[in-house]
Each structure stands twice: as C-alpha cells, then as structure tokens.
From Swiss-Prot:
Species assigned in the record: Candida albicans (strain SC5314 / ATCC MYA-2876) (Yeast)
Protein's UniProt name: Glucose starvation modulator protein 1
Described purpose of this protein according to its UniProt entry: Transcription factor which regulates nonfermentable carbon utilization.
Protein's GO biological process: cellular response to starvation
Family note: Belongs to the ERT1/acuK family.
Taxon lineage: Eukaryota, Fungi, Dikarya, Ascomycota, Saccharomycotina
UniProt key word Nucleus: yes
Gene that this sequence comes from: ZCF23
InterPro entries membership: ERT1_acuK_gluconeogen_tf (IPR050335), PAS_13 (IPR056751), Zn2-C6_fun-type_DNA-bd_sf (IPR036864), Zn2Cys6_DnaBD (IPR001138)
DNA-binding region, residues: 20-48
Amino acid sequence: MTKKLTPQEKKNRKPAVRACVFCHQKHLQCSNERPCKNCVKRNIAHGCQDIVRKRVKYLTGESVPGAVSNKQSTPRKKLKTGPVSTSVSPMDSVKSELTTPVESSNHFPPPMSSSVDALPTTQHSAIEIPPNDQPISDILEVPPLFDSSHMISSEAPETNITLTTQNLITPDPLSFHTNTVSNTTTDVLNKLLNDNYETESMLSANNSNGDHLLGMAHTSSGHLSNGQQFQSNYLNEEYMMLGDIILQSKQASPSPSNTSTSENNTNTLSPSSFGYISNINFEDFNQPKRKVVQKLKDSRPFISLGFTADLAPHDNNNNTDYYDDKMTNNITGKTEEGPGNPIINYNTKFTTDYVPPSITNNLYKTASDLYSKELKNFYYPLSYHALTKLLKVIFGGNDLSPEEKQEKRSKLLIILKLIASYRPTFIAAHRDLIQEDLLMLEMTLQRSLLDYKKLAELNSSPTIMWRRTGEIISITEDMALLLEHSSFDLLKERRFIFELMDDNSIVDYFNLFANIAVGNLKSVIQTAIQMKTKSSNLIKFTCVFTIKRDIFDIPMIVIGQFLPIV
C-alpha cells in the first residue's frame, strides 16, 4: 500500500507539471524528476517517461492555404468495387464544397472526406440511392438555395465556385418563417424588412439581370443560418416573446383613436398595384404567416398585447364603426361546449349586455347559486365609457363662470390622466384571456362579494362596495339612509360612487387609487371625503377603503366603510 502522508508532507507536496505513464495510469502523485520517485521505488525507472497528452482539435488543424495544397498533393483513393456498392449523394458533395468557405471563418476547416474525391466526374455514372433508403441527415442538410444540377466536380479542385442566378433556386418570400422556434430570434429584425422584401421580390420578376434576386438570396440565407441563434435558451425565449409582441400584436387599446392602420394591415398585395405582373396568386402570400401564428400558439405560450388575427377588424377604414357597433348592438356569441366541467358552465353566453346589481344580488344568494345558475361576464370597457361620460357631466356645465369652468376642466384633466396611467396595464393583463377566463374572474368577484356582504351585516359601520371602475355593486341600508337614497334605486341601474362625492373628493380618490392600482399591493387606505345627499347637502366622512384583488393583482372590489363626522 502507499505510505500514508503526514499533514506537513501533504502541505509541502506540489503537483508535477506532467506525470509519467505509470503514475498517470495508477493515479499517483508524480514528481518532476525523471525517473520519478514512484518508478524508482518500483524498479521500473527504465520505463519512466512523460505521458503524451492528447492534443485538442483546434491545435491539430492547419491554415487554409496549407489545407488546399495538402488536398492537391494527396493522391486520390480508388473507389472499391464490389457486389453491392454505393456512392456519395451529389448533394453531400455539394454540401462539403459549400461549407468549406463558410467554416474557414473559424480558421481551421474540418478534414475532407476521401469519398468525395472518389466521386466520378459525371453525375450520371453515380449509383443513385433510392428515396426510401436515403439517410434522413442527407434530406435535412440539403442547402436550400443551391441547385443540385450544378454540382462542382472534384476532378478540378482549383476551379473557383461562382454563384450565379442560374445556380440559385428562387426562394419563397415567406418560406423562411416556417421554422418557428429556431428562427424567432431573428424575426424581430426581419419584421422591419419583411414588407419591403416581399414587394421587392415580386418586382424582381421582370428584372432580367437577376442582381436583385441574388442580393435577396444572400440576405435570406443569413436568416437560415444557425450562427444568428443565441447559445442561451433563456435569451432565445426572450426573443420569442419579443417576436410575439412585435410581429403579431395589434393596437394596445380598443379605443378607435389608438387604432394603428399599419399594424392592422395584413399586407395583402393586389394585382392592381403591380399591373405588369401576371400569373401570381396574391392570396397565398399570407398563408404561411397564419400557419406560423397558429404554430406559435400551439407549441408554446403565446404573448400578444393587441388583437390577434382572428379578432382584429377586417376593414381598417371602418374601425370606428366597428367598435361603435360592437358597443351599441351588444355583439353576443356562445362559447363552445366543453368536456362537461362541473364547475364552469361552458354553455354560458359571453355577452356585453349589462346586468344591474339588483338582479345579480337576488340571483346569487349562496355559493352554490354561482355554479347552478347562469353567470354572465362583466364587460369593463362599457363601464369605463360610462364613467367617462359621467365625469364629463360632473365637471361640465353651461351655467358656470369662466373661472369655474376652467377649474372644473383642470380637475377633469387630472382625473383622466390618472385613469390613463393604470388602465393600459389592466387591458394588457386581460387582453389574451379567453371567454371562460373572463367568466371565472366574474365568478371570483361574485363569490367574494357574498362573503363581504355577510361581513357587512355583522359590521355596524355603513358600507358601500364598488368595482375598480367605481360602479356600485352593493350598499347597506344604513348608508343609503344617510345619503337619503334607496338602496334599490342605487342598484337597479349603472350608478357610480362618484355620483355621491363632491368634486375635490373625486380627485382625491383617483389620486389614492392610482397609487395602489399597479405595482403597490397596499390593500387598505384611510382618508376623509365629503359625500353628497339627495338634497345636495354635504356630509363629511372618515372612511377606510379595503382593496380586494384578482389573480393578476388588479383591484377587483373596493369595500368602503364610512363613519360620519358629526
């Protein structure tokens, strides 16, 4: 056995620069002198020599000129003939010749296969491999833009390779978007050039010299190169997300004023735009894009901050009419039936019809009623439109002096700016939710409302509950009596909490709500406001607002408890 070393010996011992063969095989600590101590101790000093290290691949190669001269001086091997002989596919030889200049950028090309040199000079003399027996790697690695009929002969290695328009196959303008996962990293940049690229590719049909087509081929071949992909999977996923947002997203708000014609444009080129181009089916140009979008949605989580292709309006010139018609006519559509989920009723209608709180409060009195009875989603855009109209009425008026009008207008602008600071976040969070998701959010709100109404019955303080838009959904009888209103009158139609506040209290409320709407998860706010009675009298309250949030941390219900100051 090997002698056990003392701690001092272990501390003083230093590793050798290079071990001998024996110490390397036996995993022993070798010394720098030759013969080493271990070999002398075992009487094998005559065979003590340094181990020959295996050289790494990039040190074994030669420079590019040396490699070419080596190939010219190396005699070619004769092709052995036998009862069953196979030859290298013409595409393999083309691939090896084409990849040599590209890989030479890494300073050392891979060793050339001798079977390429043994290829006959004529293509007809090669024994063809049946399509069923052809290796899959040969099919997958075929250069997409090179014509196999113009094969480079191995008998003339010094011949320069020239790529002309006759050697290049005309690429499909949209065929580069088929590989979704590997090519999304470059789609972000290619989107900026995609529209011009498609147009110029069709204009080049009448270009006889073919120079523009050659430039497009070189540009598009870079799109298929793996060199543009990142080595980090996380970085690739980041670019996939950016590709989703930039390539497929439409306008960020359903408001007609924010509609972007260029984003909604599907780039469908009509023959009238290119009257001199014939025999081109312009309807097929957008088909690969739609397949890519569907493939993105099916393969991984899809991110979109706007309308997708199936939800966007088809006529960009009539977007205003589209949204107005959608809000006024209450477009409804039934959801598809699911696989019999006992919790969510998939037969429930997805509708924009308004259901007043007086009906829902009487309809859903227990938790089981939410699952046994029909539930309708709440359409928040209509609520925000109604809120905007109400604010214009509150802060407007023709019987005011110019100073009062200016003061009210400044308050209205402050409120609208505060709403604009957090509403886009609400829209982005709920943009890609399907109909069942919206029904689930409404079910969550109604379920929470049941608990809070029971809590309000046990609490002595007057309470009002409203949605994040300010729309009242519940009020206790004592609070309604303080404000000289009937609870049924406040719940039978769309009424807002701001109708019961004075102007300064409305501005203060929106300042407080904007601070906790996004980012700040504070759930309790204490403040003092003034409420208006039905007879226009003002009552000062000290109040506590409790914020109930949904699964996106967006305010869902605001529970206001009011204590009048006498």
